[in-house]
């Protein structure tokens, strides 16, 4: 699950707004594109998942993602260099050592 979300953030480079990230994960999970099982609640501002928020907090503490404020105050979620290395290592592990021979 962590790698699914990390990979999503890496794919987009950065995602403007945590609300947008929650909405994107909700849509992709609903369509079966993301293999996650977050529970979402619909609010007036969009979909929100406490589970996803906790995962994002963990990813931040592990320094795999960062959330910064843009000039207009919007939160921007980005993958860090460390996050990219973890993602690459995990993808290489999934492929197996013989796949590169």
Predicted regions and their residues:
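Domain-edge interaction signal
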Residues: 1-101
